[in-house]
Structures are given as C-alpha cells and as structure tokens.
A protein has these predicted regions:
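Active-site-proximal alpha-helix that buttresses catalytic centers in soluble enzyme cores
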Residues: 2-7, 18-22, 26-199, 203, ...
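A short, acidic, amphipathic alpha-helical segment used as a generic capping/interface helix at domain edges
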Residues: 233-257
Length: 303
C-alpha cells in the first residue's frame, strides 16, 4: 500500500515545520509486482563502502561527498548508469539509501543496553520518561542527523568551485517507509534542495522496519504482533524493489519508470536486508547514514 505526500520546503531562514503526515496506509498486503527481479550491486563500485580496505564502522554517518571514491565524479556515475540502460541486459538505477535519524527507541536502547532492550523494554511503549511505541518520533539528535545530510547536499550542489559533473544528481523519485521517523528524516534531508516547491514522497509499506515484537515497529496500538524472519524481510524487500524497478503499468504507482536516480528513506533492518539481497558489502549503518548504490535489476526467471 502506498500514499503520496508532499513536503514543501520553507524559506531558508525558517526552522523546519512540524511534521504533519498526510493520509497513511495501514498495515496490509502490498500489490504484487508485475515482474519479480533479481538485484545486484554494480561492481566495481563507485563508492568507498564496497572497498575492502574501508573500515565502514569508523565512517561517520554522513561521509564527505556521500562516499564517492576519489578520482571519480558524479557525472561518471550518471553517464555509466545511462550507458548501461541503453545497452540493455538489465535496469540500472543510482539509489541513495538512507537510515532514519536517531529515534526515541534508539535512545531507549542506548539507555538500557541492547540485551535489556531486546528482552524487556522493546516490548513496552515507554518507561514513564520516554515514549517509543508505537511509531516513535525522532529525537533532537535524530533531527540534527537528518539536517546534517541536508547540509551535505547543499554543500555539494551549491559549491561555486564545482563543475556540473562534480555535483551529485538529485533523486528523481523519493520513497519512504510509512514510519514517522523515516518520513521526517526524508523531509529534513531534502528540505530546500529542490527549491520552493519541495518534492513528493511516496510511502511504501514494504519499506517498513522488520516486523516483530518491538512496539517501536508497530504502526498503531492495534498492529498485530507477528514475527518476520530475516529471509522473509529480504523477500518482502525484493518484491518492493521489483515494484519500484518495474515499468509503469497504470495499476501500481510505485514504479520509477524513467527515473534513473531515486532515494529511499528506511531503517537499519531494511538496509541490511538490501545488502544481503544485492551482494553489497554488509555492515550496520549508523542512524542518519546515507549510502549510495548502483543497482542492477534483471527478471528473476533469467538468473
């Protein structure tokens, strides 16, 4: 299920407006993709995350120039994606994948420790001081982390000493998990970079965090407590990406047909599932991280 939402960008002098979500779909089955795709990460990669010599754990959430390797320009990435799509043999897209900034649940886990969080506190809605379920908000640090990504976008796009080829291409479509923390992160990440009109976000249920017993991953107090295995999460993400990569059919608005650059705002569990699905180097992204990838999609029946 999905719903469209527009987040207009305010004048630069204004503080970010309070988050006011529009219509949001409830939990339920998403439309099946017209074609199931198999996904791989383009190798060799343009980005430092796939470099074996890179200590990804030591990287900041926002890597300068979003982790583009030295000696490579964004124009090189765009040109290669365009060339590969023209040659055929698959559908290629540059995908900026972002983890939401710190949420109240992340703060609570840090407060109590992972073991106590998983065993006890994650199954509650709060502790009398913090409220993290269902659907927790960003903390002030989480808001700042999203704004740090926004600052990097502005720095790269408006550097007077940069050539057009050195500037990162903006996503042509924005996708988000239905959770408030992901939506608010995307809003703050891209605020103002598209000009005064802003950019529409498309909410996809399939980008939500791992379904389990944690109250922070429930859509509402009535959300069913079901447990999703690692394999089921990967399968769910594959189906969602297949909808995004499929040609427009008129029946599924998730298609990014014609867009060679897209962005996804989601969660740590979803990003790790994406790494498993595509063969990307596996790591745990920090809150507020933005990781670019070039993905190739081919019909699953041909692999």
């Amino acid at each position: 299920m999905q719903a469209a939402m527009t987040a207009p960008a305010p004048a630069p002098a204004q503080a970010p407006a309070a988050f006011a979500p529009g219509p949001s779909p409830g939990p339920g089955p998403a439309p099946a993709p017209a074609q199931l795709y198999a996904f791989t990460t383009l190798q060799p990669s343009f980005f430092i995350y796939d470099n074996p010599s890179t200590d990804v754990a030591a990287l900041p959430a926002v890597v300068p120039n979003f982790g583009l390797k030295e000696g490579v320009e964004w124009g090189d990435v765009v040109q290669e994606v365009r060339r590969l799509n023209e040659v055929g043999g698959g559908v290629y897209k540059l995908v900026y994948v972002g983890r939401h900034g710190q949420g109240v649940h992340n703060l609570a886990e840090a407060k109590y420790g992972t073991e106590a969080w998983d065993d006890d506190w994650s199954h509650r809605n709060g502790d009398g001081e913090l409220v993290w379920g269902p659907d927790p908000l960003l903390t002030s640090l989480g808001e700042q982390q999203a704004e740090d990504v926004n600052e990097e976008w502005r720095l790269r796009l408006h550097n007077p000493n940069s050539t057009p080829s050195q500037k990162p291409p903006l996503p042509q479509r924005l996708y988000s998990s239905p959770f408030t923390r992901a939506l608010e992160t995307a809003k703050r990440t891209y605020m103002g970079v598209y000009g005064s009109e802003g950019k529409e976000q498309l909410i996809l249920e399939g980008l939500r965090e791992t379904i389990g017993g944690h109250t922070c991953d429930m859509r509402s107090p009535k959300s069913p407590i079901a447990r999703e295995s690692e394999e089921e999460l990967v399968e769910r993400l594959q189906e969602t990406l297949s909808r995004i990569f499929s040609p427009a059919t008129g029946t599924d608005v998730a298609s990014s047909d014609g867009a060679q650059v897209i962005a996804i705002s989601c969660h740590s569990g979803v990003m790790q599932a994406l790494f498993r699905l595509t063969g990307h180097r596996f790591f745990t992204p920090k809150t507020g991280a933005l990781v670019p990838m070039v993905l190739k999609a081919v019909p699953a029946t041909s692999t």
